[in-house]
């Protein structure tokens, strides 16, 4: 196995692990505060590792032509960096287990910041995944027989269903209120099975992956059309 192939596998593994942790972190009350802190640390470590593995892209941000797609990708990445940093710092301030001995002040502000940034992390990271979804589709397409295009249409239909339910779950789970800061406290139904909770959040993630993917395709098409006109 080539070095490039090994690095690609590590990248996929890291990104998959981040996706799982992101979903679990959203169920703060259901997994317990101590577990939430450990998962948060794990997420931060994986986030740093993700940037190390993708350092070539970071170095090339200011190089080349600035298209709408690149601008969308870069702005999303910068916002994720900001919200993740705020989540990590505010999480350390609020810690009652791992960093409790530090006795950091500012808990009230940290609680507001942690809640806002936590939900924006979820949305932005889902969009980020959607931006790169074409690459994942490309990898999966190699496994699908070319003489069976029906499988691609089934996959597209399934993604539309997930995104459609994601709209409902987005509203039902009150994410607009959490993202806007209108609601300062998160409500959890303690009797609800965590599986149902996670399924709703998977659907919401699917919604933003869907939006990120097709918006990225639209921006690429706009750039392609401009290039054709100029020729």
What is each model feature region?
Residues 1-231:
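Membrane-embedded alpha-helical bundles that constitute the cytochrome b-like, heme-associated redox core
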């Amino acid at each position: 196995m080539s070095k490039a192939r090994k690095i690609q596998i590590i990248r996929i593994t890291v990104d998959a692990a981040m996706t799982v942790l992101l979903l679990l972190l959203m169920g703060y009350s259901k997994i317990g505060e101590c577990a939430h802190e450990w998962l948060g640390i794990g997420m931060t470590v994986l986030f740093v590792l993700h940037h190390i593995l993708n350092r070539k892209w970071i170095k090339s941000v200011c190089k080349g032509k600035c298209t709408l797609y690149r601008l969308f990708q870069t702005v999303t990445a910068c916002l994720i960096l900001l919200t993740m940093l705020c989540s990590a710092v505010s999480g350390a301030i609020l810690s009652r287990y791992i960093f409790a001995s530090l006795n950091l002040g500012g808990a009230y502000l940290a609680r507001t910041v942690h809640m806002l940034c936590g939900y924006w992390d979820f949305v932005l990271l889902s969009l980020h995944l959607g931006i790169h979804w074409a690459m994942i589709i490309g990898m999966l397409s190699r496994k699908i027989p070319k003489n069976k295009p029906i499988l691609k249409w089934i996959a597209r239909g399934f993604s539309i269903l997930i995104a459609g339910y994601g709209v409902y779950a987005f509203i039902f789970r009150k994410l607009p209120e959490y993202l806007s800061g209108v609601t300062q406290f998160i409500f959890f139904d303690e009797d609800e099975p965590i599986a149902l909770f996670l399924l709703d959040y998977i659907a919401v993630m699917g919604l933003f992956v869907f939006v990120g993917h097709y918006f990225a395709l639209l921006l690429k098409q706009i750039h392609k059309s401009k290039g054709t006109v100029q020729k």
